[in-house]
Amino acid sequence: MRSIMEVETLKRLALMGANKEQVSLSSSIFATSLGMSPQTAARRLSALEEDGYITRVVTPEGQKVRITEKGITCLKSEYRDYCSIFEDGGAPVMRGKVVTGLGEGQYYISLDGYRNQFNDKLGFDPYPGTLNVRLTEPFIPAEHEAVVIAGFKGENRTFGGCKCYPVRIKGVRAAIIRPDRTSYPPNLIEIIAPIKLRESLGLRDGDEVEVTLE
């Protein structure tokens, strides 16, 4: 999301029910609810549509708007941020099920260019492999929470950077690792730890787990 005003516009649409269904929108009434001119409101809607946060259908009577999955994900991220500010309920907990990964983690985590940074920045030497968890909700962290792992050049290729997010799983210190370039959906996470989590925690595919953000 590019600006606070666009977030506010998206929130206003959700309060009108656009997160659940397509709603008819009067430009003048909508602009008044946001405290801005119809022209400015139209630009906000256009920006949201261009960025993929809403869909719009223009009719002779006005327009019909619905928030996309991307827009809902954005609102959920905002919600979690406000919960962390105002609620005194402890660290955020994510829930999901263990799944089989692609098997590429062992190779990449073993590379010294990554491994040395994991040691320095996360404080542990990771087991060469990842635990993959499919969450019930997308994992959309705030940028300031990330531990940045820089990319580097090998003998024959360049390796991209990634971001890590310290967590605990069943009391074990670990970290979610998310490459800067990934084909994984937002609700699928890879976890590294100083031990083989599957073996040490007795986990199998389909087992439900809780992942606590540090």
Curated annotation (Swiss-Prot):
It is an enzyme of class 2 (transferase). The keyword Kinase applies. Keywords: Flavoprotein, FMN, Kinase, Magnesium, Metal-binding, Nucleotide-binding, Transferase. FMN binds at residues 182, 190. InterPro entries: RibK_CTP-dep (IPR039063), Riboflavin_kinase_archaeal (IPR023470), Riboflavin_kinase_CTP-dep (IPR023602), Riboflavin_kinase_dom_sf (IPR023465), WH-like_DNA-bd_sf (IPR036388), WH_DNA-bd_sf (IPR036390). GO terms for molecular function: magnesium ion binding; nucleotide binding; riboflavin kinase activity. Its cofactor is Mg(2+). Mg(2+) binds at residues 130, 132. Its EC number is 2.7.1.161. The keyword Nucleus does not apply. Residues 92-214 are annotated as: Riboflavin kinase. Pathway: Cofactor biosynthesis; FMN biosynthesis; FMN from riboflavin (CTP route): step 1/1. Residues 1-91 are annotated as: H-T-H motif-like. It catalyses: riboflavin + CTP = CDP + FMN + H(+). Binds 1 Mg(2+) ion per subunit. CDP binds at residues 101-106, 195-198. SUPFAM superfamilies: Riboflavin kinase-like (SSF82114), Winged helix' DNA-binding domain (SSF46785). One of its GO terms (biological process) is FMN biosynthetic process. Catalyzes the CTP-dependent phosphorylation of riboflavin (vitamin B2) to form flavin mononucleotide (FMN). Belongs to the archaeal riboflavin kinase family. This is Riboflavin kinase. The lineage of its organism: Archaea, Methanobacteriati, Methanobacteriota, Stenosarchaea group, Methanomicrobia.
